[in-house]
Amino acid sequence: TIHRRGESMLKTGMIIAERYEILGKIGTGGMADVYKAKDHKLNRFVAVKVLKPEFREDTTFIRKFKSEAQAAAVLTHPNIVNVFDVGDDNGVYYIVMELIEGITLKEYISKKGKLSVKEATSIAIQVSMGLEAAHSHGIVHRDVKPQNIIISKDGKVKVADFGIARAATSQTITVSAVGSVHYISPEQARGGYSDARSDIYSFGITMYEMVTGRVPFEGDNTVTVALAHLEETITRPS
């Protein structure tokens, strides 16, 4: 069991919530680290997303993080990474999710350069089905990008990290926006209200990158790129 509050990195063999045995770190993001774990209660492998220490003192963020994860747990769909559990163990806040063996769409695009229209269409259909399922439950992703889309070894496409972006405070947005700003909707760039249409815009940018191998707007910093989404016209992918 975890004994020290704010453990910066979980060690192999640690047990979370007297149930999930940490087997190793498999990824990291702006706000959380991801570990492969064994669920000893249901005897299956899972992914455990653990909040980074710098966000564990932000009580407003913690509250939103939990409520959004609980909302996302309602979603069960073949094109969504399903959430199984959420909680905290002695100050370590975690989300337990379906473990997907595969790579992100971002990694796949980087490897291939750009995708054929046929392949991009197949991926796009699966992503849109996952988003439609979420939107029909009133859940908006708010951070749709290739890094949050996973392609499993058997070719199934799944959208990950529902609700986590919404929980982010302005402080966490600044930290994690480096990869996200290229896919941000104009209303998000403006700092205004965003809804399901924001996801569709970000999904459109993702589709653009699939067929061209690049994002439509580049810049020296996040502000420059965000302004481009507000003010500039996207060049047709050809």
Annotate each language-model stretch with its function:
Residues I22-G29, V34:
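Protein kinase glycine-rich loop
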Residues V127-I139:
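Protein kinase catalytic-loop region centered on the HRD/HxD motif
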Residues N90-T104, Y108:
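Conserved short submotifs of the Hanks-type protein kinase catalytic core
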Residues V86:
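Activation-segment/catalytic-loop signature of the eukaryotic protein kinase fold
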Residues H182-S238:
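C-terminal lobe helix-coil module of Hanks-type protein kinase domains
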Residues I123-A124:
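Activation segment signature within eukaryotic-like protein kinase domains
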Residues K52-V74:
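AlphaC helix of the eukaryotic protein kinase fold
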